[in-house]
């Protein structure tokens, strides 16, 4: 689990003396790290009784051509670039902003696969 509360250190490097401890609502979850493979989803219960769909694996993307505005589904071949983490390129992990190669051309992922449960992308070439 990840803790998403405020830091225990000040900007100067000194310790902050907290008036209280950690709270459960400050906890986060590990990232989904969506890989290129046969589609695999996971439902997660979130705060307020809501649900979030985590996309663990995916091999298809909804690709929009900005010139004509049409969206088509195409298989994902590989990850070419990922600004989130340079090591994600070798591991073929999809995140928002990653550049993927498809039969239609290179595209940039615009959705958040670990949060939305789908891979949407826009052609860049």
Swiss-Prot record:
The entry's keywords: Ribonucleoprotein, Ribosomal protein
Q: Which residues cross the membrane?
A: none
Locate the coiled-coil region(s) and give their ranges: none
Recorded GO molecular functions are: structural constituent of ribosome
One matching Pfam family, short form? Answer: Ribosomal_S8e
Q: Which Gene3D superfamilies match?
A: 2.40.10.310
Q: Name the PROSITE patterns on file.
A: RIBOSOMAL_S8E (PS01193)
BP-aspect Gene Ontology terms: translation
* GO CC terms in record: ribonucleoprotein complex; ribosome
State the HAMAP family in the record.
Answer: Ribosomal_eS8 (MF_00029)
Describe the family membership recorded for this protein in Swiss-Prot or TrEMBL: Belongs to the eukaryotic ribosomal protein eS8 family.
What is known about its subunit structure? Part of the 30S ribosomal subunit.
Protein name as annotated? Small ribosomal subunit protein eS8
Recall the taxonomic lineage recorded for the source organism.
Answer: Archaea, Methanobacteriati, Methanobacteriota, Stenosarchaea group, Methanomicrobia
């Amino acid at each position: 689990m990840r803790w998403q509360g405020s830091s225990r250190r000040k900007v100067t490097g000194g310790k902050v003396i907290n008036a209280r401890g950690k709270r459960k609502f400050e906890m986060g979850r590990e990232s989904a790290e969506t890989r290129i493979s046969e589609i695999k989803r996971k439902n997660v219960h979130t705060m307020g009784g809501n649900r979030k769909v985590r996309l663990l694996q995916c091999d298809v993307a909804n690709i929009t051509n900005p010139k004509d505005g049409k969206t088509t589904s195409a298989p994902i071949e590989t990850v070419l670039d990922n600004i989130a983490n340079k090591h994600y390129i070798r591991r073929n992990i999809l995140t928002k902003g990653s550049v993927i190669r498809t039969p239609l051309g290179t595209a940039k992922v615009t959705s958040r696969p670990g949060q939305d449960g789908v891979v949407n992308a826009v052609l860049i070439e």
